[in-house]
Amino acid sequence: MKIKLAKSEVIHFIGIGGIGMSGLSLIMKRKGFKVQGSDISNNKNTNRLKKENIKVFVGHQKENINKATIIVVSSAIKKNNPELLHAKLKQLPIYKRGEMLANIVSLTKNIVVVGSHGKTTTTSLIASIFQNTKIDPTIINGGIINSINNTAKLGKSDWSILEADESDGSFIFIPPTYSIITNIDREHMDYYSSMKELNKYFVNFVDKVPSFGKSFICLDDKNNKNLIKNLKNKNFYTYGLDIKSNFCIKNIKQYRFFSEFDLRIILPNKKKRIIRK
């Protein structure tokens, strides 16, 4: 999906205080767009946004969107929200967070982390690794990353590192270059009609990874194993504690502030390697 955006647009985020919405709004602001939003109360996220000169309305009222030309709505917002209803009455373009996220990263090489659990931790680890390289990626995470002291950062390179939210199915709009699937659990059944439908979304997402990219799927999760069986796109590696994983973690030792482990790597047509860390 390609969303045409002009710098004159006023983009209003309904539910801007959410961790994912606040990060996306920050990136849009730093890209030069006019950004505002609303939430039911102030929190740490809205306070960070105010420091970036992003206007935040406390409470949801139809008057909040008087100047808005585009609406981005959180998956937590109910259908009877007065701002959402007024936006529909005004026939304003309305997008889910995932749709807008997909639009701003569509021209970048990206790493997209999806799954029911562990997304934020995984995204944070990848982002922190990139922070120690010469690559300066755009980062949008579901939690504070210590290395940037924020949930999001606009980078100068053509790389993006993203945490994608599966709660409303909008992650399917994101075109992944590299994807990481942590696990799939029985969640968000208010949106998905069944586990079968939830699994189908993940299958469709992984199948979109191009031949020059790659997916990395945790083999420790039983639903991920079912995911693999249904994939048309076999361009993936597996990881985890499972001995059949391409990247297998062994001999784990946990200490107070760090862990040690051996990493066994077995790739098709490659010699087995063991990295001790």
Annotated model-derived regions:
Residues 1-57, 67-71, 87-92, 124, ...:
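ATP-dependent carboxylate-amine ligase
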Residues 2-4, 27-33, 50, 63-64, ...:
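Phosphate-binding loop of NTP-binding sites
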Residues 3-10, 14, 49-50, 74-75, ...:
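Adenine nucleotide phosphate-binding catalytic loops in nucleotide-utilizing enzymes
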Residues 36, 106, 262-265:
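Active-site-flanking structural segment that lines cofactor/substrate pockets
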Residues 37-39, 143-144, 149-151, 246-255:
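Short linear motifs in intrinsically disordered
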Residues 40-41, 61, 99-100, 241:
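Short, ordered loop/turn segments at secondary-structure junctions
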Residues 66-68, 156-158, 255-259:
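A short, glycine/Asx- and small/polar-enriched loop/turn
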